């Protein structure tokens, strides 16, 4: 019997990967003591390796927080510029109204 004559096994299709929302829901739903989110220092031989991994993890989260804060600051800057423009135009209108009142009283 040749290999072509053998019946091919049909494998099931691969499931779709989870959506970003599903991943975020899983991460946010995880408890703090989840083994994925903690560093285990019980093995002394891998202590330095784990410490390095924990430090990298800490730096990663600090970087993520920095990026988030930077994005929030950019949004705040845009909002403040818009409010500044509104206040500037209101101040100019107020000065015009004051000048008109001065002229009207004279």
Curated annotation (Swiss-Prot):
Similarity comment text for this entry: Belongs to the UPF0449 family.
Name of the protein in its database record: UPF0449 protein C19orf25 homolog
Pfam family, one: UPF0449
InterPro entries, sorted: UPF0449
